[in-house]
Regions:
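Membrane-anchoring hydrophobic helices of lipid-metabolizing enzymes
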Residues: 1-87, 100-102, 109-111, 130, ...
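Short, charged beta->alpha transition segments
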Residues: 70-79, 118-121, 151-154
Length: 312
């Protein structure tokens, strides 16, 4: 049996590889992440978890400072007035790691507790636990049971004044067939259900930009993993492995740059309440986010972007 030689890696939780993947897939993901500068980020993570997290102050804003990523927002933030209702923040998901940290850096400026709905595998980073609600995207009975419990917990927290952050796509935006503008993956019904059950108002946010061309090209066949047929499944799983391995590379590309975000007017519960049909409500939330997108001229998306200097 072939055994892959591996070296001890600092902070193994800072990886998208997981024990449920085949050994070859884990090795490949680790290799690409290493070439993308993962170990440099591990050193910054070590400083962040020891020196920043214990203070409880600007935890995510200071994380962005460490990795030299700015957040450029033309709108007033925090908003001058917030409704006296439970509050949900909903955003698109163009980058993966970068917009996740950016939205949390904005949420912490509201001066109230907050949680983000994230993939359960990301809770390997223990420092994220106090700020997270884990979602299981596998379609098992246990996953359904877990997600129902998480939804009930989210509603309870909303009623207690905790802001909940949701990326309704549940995954990183992808360009159709690898070219053109990236599009959010189909939105899940979860946020509409959450808003209705908690009678929450919503702050829509739109993050501009997208990952590099290579990320989208390798993502093209990922849906084949759900098809019948060994060849289709193999191609689909290989695509997912390649896509996953590039997420840290895409995060590294943001270093030295600013993420542009636009914030819409608060969608009050009184405005959303008449939308009893959840699909209609979800469509309204979707428009609330993507109506904020700036009208940009078509631009060339780099296949292999210039290497960016990582923060020391």
């Amino acid at each position: 049996m072939l055994k892959m030689k591996t070296r001890e890696r600092p902070f193994p939780e800072l990886s998208y590889a997981n024990p449920h993947q085949p050994a070859l897939a884990r090795w490949f993901i680790h290799s690409v992440e290493g070439l993308s500068g993962r170990d440099r980020f591990a050193a910054l993570y070590d400083f962040w978890r020891r020196q920043v997290v214990p203070t409880g102050e600007r935890v995510f804003s200071r994380m962005l400072d460490l990795i030299d990523v700015g957040v450029r927002i033309p709108d007033q933030w925090p908003p001058a007035q917030l409704p006296d209702t439970p509050l949900v923040i909903i955003a698109n998901h163009p980058f993966g790691i970068g917009d996740g940290i950016a939205v949390l850096s904005l949420a912490e400026q509201l001066g109230r507790p907050f949680r983000v709905m994230i993939h359960k595998d990301l809770l390997r980073i223990r420092e994220m636990e106090p700020y997270s609600l884990p979602i299981d995207f596998s379609e098992t009975k246990d996953a359904v049971k877990n997600n129902m419990a998480v939804r009930h917990e989210a509603v309870r927290l909303l009623r207690e004044g905790v802001t909940i952050v949701v990326f309704p796509a549940g995954g990183v935006a992808t360009a159709p067939k690898g070219f053109g503008r990236a599009r959010d993956l189909p939105w899940k019904m979860f946020p509409a259900r959450l808003v209705q059950e908690a009678k929450a108002s919503v702050i829509p946010m739109h993050f501009s930009g997208q990952n590099g061309r290579l990320f989208h090209l390798v993502s093209g066949p990922m849906n084949m993993a759900e098809r019948d047929g060994r060849v289709a499944k193999f191609v689909g799983k290989a695509s997912l492995t390649l896509r996953t391995s590039l997420l840290i590379r895409e995060f590294a590309r943001l270093s030295g740059r600013a993420i542009d975000v636009r914030v819409g007017n608060v969608l009050s519960w009184s405005e959303l309440e008449p939308l009893r049909d959840r699909k209609t409500l979800l469509d309204r939330l979707y428009r609330g986010v993507f109506d904020l997108a700036p009208s940009l001229p078509r631009r060339r998306i780099p296949f292999l972007p210039a290497r960016t200097k990582l923060a020391a």
